[in-house]
């Protein structure tokens, strides 16, 4: 696959899926991170993200997002891990920036007819006497590369793989294939077509991921900075997902005594790193304020444990309890950013030099 030279264009480009649930989920996630995609004309395939000036957004089929990353036509992409593995085929230039964007969750697996009572595992399928060199197992899939590698790794030689783009579940009933290898989410479609998964037949787990070209990250000005900002926003939003801030007024003699009381209530009341305790200034009759009677305690807790937290705070004398969702939780530095720099052979000071248009520090 011929690769476009870096100097062939100046604009930074990101490719995202153009159709289907993956496209909707991608844009919803970006919008949640204040990275809304704006398309001036609904018929156009090019768009922009106003909060990221200088970057073009291109709507492409999922397969083409990966291909255009490989050819250098886009620098950044959002795509399912399944498609990255199938089309990217472990291309060393493709770097996974974020491997768990929280949507598109599914897995790629082998499914056989439910009528095959004696085939409930891959080992049983492998030893099935019905299939031989003269009469190989016929597998239909849209993931030819992954299927070929999977069956080879399992030592299954008597397999013929055919390709199809849709309605794979109908192939065994039609007699066009013996089994399928396809994406599974809930498994409902398999059951409705009288198919079943087998033990050991799971090829990989998949969900949406953020991918970038290694060459673009290192050589195209601005790409690494944009990826850093996107990663910060994504990590902060995803970390806050399902986390609520609970605030209560607690009586105490000092902030330290209140903090000790809260922490003694167990791990639930310790929040993300520990409770935040702040003095409340109570208005007095003479117009002044008095500190030290009540303290505001704020704790980040999972949504599923909100009421349990409220009850615990009440037992400690808490009142005026407020609960509100968190939108972002920014870390000191996202762990995935540190990991990305390591994959690129860079350190934090190298990023600072690159962001100023300078060469990385020689080592």
Q: Where are the model-predicted features located?
A:
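Small-molecule-sensing regulatory modules
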Residues: 2-59, 78-107, 116-363
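Conserved, well-structured functional cores that handle cations and Mg-NTP chemistry
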Residues: 65, 75-79
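Active-site charged/polar residues at nucleotide-handling catalytic sites that mediate phosphoryl
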Residues: 72
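Periplasmic solute-binding protein
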Residues: 110
């Amino acid at each position: 696959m011929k690769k476009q030279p870096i100097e062939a264009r100046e604009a930074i480009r990101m490719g995202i899926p153009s159709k289907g649930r993956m496209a909707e989920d991608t844009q919803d996630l970006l919008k949640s991170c204040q990275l809304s995609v704006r398309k001036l004309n609904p018929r156009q395939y090019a768009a922009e993200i106003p909060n990221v000036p200088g970057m073009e957004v291109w709507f492409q089929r999922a397969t083409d997002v990966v291909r255009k990353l490989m050819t250098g036509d886009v620098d950044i992409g959002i795509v399912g891990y399944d498609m990255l593995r199938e089309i990217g085929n472990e291309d060393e230039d493709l770097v996974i920036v974020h491997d768990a964007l929280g949507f598109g969750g599914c897995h790629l697996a082998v499914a056989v007819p439910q009528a095959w009572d004696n085939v409930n595992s891959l080992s049983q399928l492998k030893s099935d006497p019905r299939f031989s060199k003269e009469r190989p197992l016929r597998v239909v899939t849209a993931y030819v590369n992954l299927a070929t590698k999977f069956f080879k790794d399992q030592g299954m030689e008597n397999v013929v793989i055919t390709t199809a783009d849709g309605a794979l579940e109908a192939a065994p009933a039609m007699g066009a294939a013996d089994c399928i290898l396809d994406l599974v989410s809930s498994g409902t479609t398999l059951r409705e077509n009288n198919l079943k998964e087998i033990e050991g037949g799971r090829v990989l787990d998949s969900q949406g991921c953020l991918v970038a070209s290694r060459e673009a990250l290192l050589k195209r000005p601005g790409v690494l900075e944009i990826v850093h900002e996107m990663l910060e926003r994504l990590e902060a939003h995803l970390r806050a997902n399902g986390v609520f801030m609970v605030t209560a007024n607690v009586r105490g003699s000092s902030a330290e005594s209140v903090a000790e009381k809260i922490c003694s209530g167990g791990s639930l009341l310790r929040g993300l790193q520990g409770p935040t305790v702040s003095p409340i200034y109570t208005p007095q009759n003479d117009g002044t304020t008095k500190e030290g009677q009540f303290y505001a305690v704020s704790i980040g807790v999972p949504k599923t444990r909100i009421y349990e937290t409220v009850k615990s705070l009440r037992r400690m004398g808490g009142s005026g309890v407020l609960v509100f969702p968190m939108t972002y939780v920014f870390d000191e530095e996202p762990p995935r950013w540190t990991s990305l720099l390591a994959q690129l052979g860079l350190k934090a000071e190298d990023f600072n030099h690159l962001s100023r248009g300078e060469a990385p520090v020689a080592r």
